[in-house]
Amino acid sequence: MMIRLIIHGCNGKMGKVVAKLAKENPEFEVVAGVDKNTFPLDFPVYSDLKEVKEEADVVIDFSYHEAIPNLVKEAAKRKIPVVIATTGLSEEELKTVEEASKEIPIFRSANMSLGINVLISLVKEAAKVLEGFDIEIVEKHHNMKKDAPSGTALMIADAINQVLPEKREYVYGRYTKTEQRKPNEIGIHAVRGGTIVGEHDVIFAGPNEVITISHSAQSREVFGYGALKAAKFLIGQKPGLYTMEDLVKKG
């Protein structure tokens, strides 16, 4: 069965990547796009999901966080599953997503790369063993990225905190710090420059040794492939919130 897609944010960098990959894959067909820039592509483009006339099986979103509430509300009305790859959502926006997930299956991940999710599994195991080590996360992205720290860096920090006996406090940069580092911290640092697609280093620093676990995305296509895998995963799922961990478990 061919999976019919609507790409929300189709004229953005990642939207175009997903459209290209879907066109090359016989399992998918892009039936429509949604974007504030309605420049026509190989499929009709609308300014709002409400305007879309085409029937679809899944919406893949690579847009901006302010657009998410309207997207999930309309998708819930239409009973269309949604893959959300947009980062930087506020608490209020996340609540709207959770509410919509009672009506439709929603897949949300701050990073659609399978590799970064392997990194998360590795750092969770490392955090269990290296319990007393200092932990620092350094993320690097291109100079057009607006949110800092990245959603992925926060996702990594949250995953580490899940397995520690006591949760650690997040410290964002140390620019105004004039005191010694506290042992109950996870330092999170953002670098922005050039065309860096995405790099994440997780540093475990202990007495006389340092372990660094790293992931580097070489192309935006890794996120596009992950989004298509997520779309396929959502077909037939019950309403609820799903993550890359669910996809990896399913294999």
Swiss-Prot record:
Coiled coil: none
Enzymatic class: oxidoreductase
Binding site for (S)-2,3,4,5-tetrahydrodipicolinate: 142, 151-152
PANTHER family: 4-HYDROXY-TETRAHYDRODIPICOLINATE REDUCTASE, DIHYDRODIPICOLINATE REDUCTASE
InterPro entries: DapB_C, DapB_N, DapB_N_CS, DHDPR_bac, NAD(P)-bd_dom_sf
Enzyme Commission no: 1.17.1.8
Protein name as annotated: 4-hydroxy-tetrahydrodipicolinate reductase
Family: Belongs to the DapB family.
This protein's pathway: Amino-acid biosynthesis; L-lysine biosynthesis via DAP pathway; (S)-tetrahydrodipicolinate from L-aspartate: step 4/4
Catalytic activity: (S)-2,3,4,5-tetrahydrodipicolinate + NAD(+) + H2O = (2S,4S)-4-hydroxy-2,3,4,5-tetrahydrodipicolinate + NADH + H(+); (S)-2,3,4,5-tetrahydrodipicolinate + NADP(+) + H2O = (2S,4S)-4-hydroxy-2,3,4,5-tetrahydrodipicolinate + NADPH + H(+)
Protein's cellular compartments: Cytoplasm
Molecular function (Gene Ontology), one example: oxidoreductase activity, acting on CH or CH2 groups, NAD or NADP as acceptor
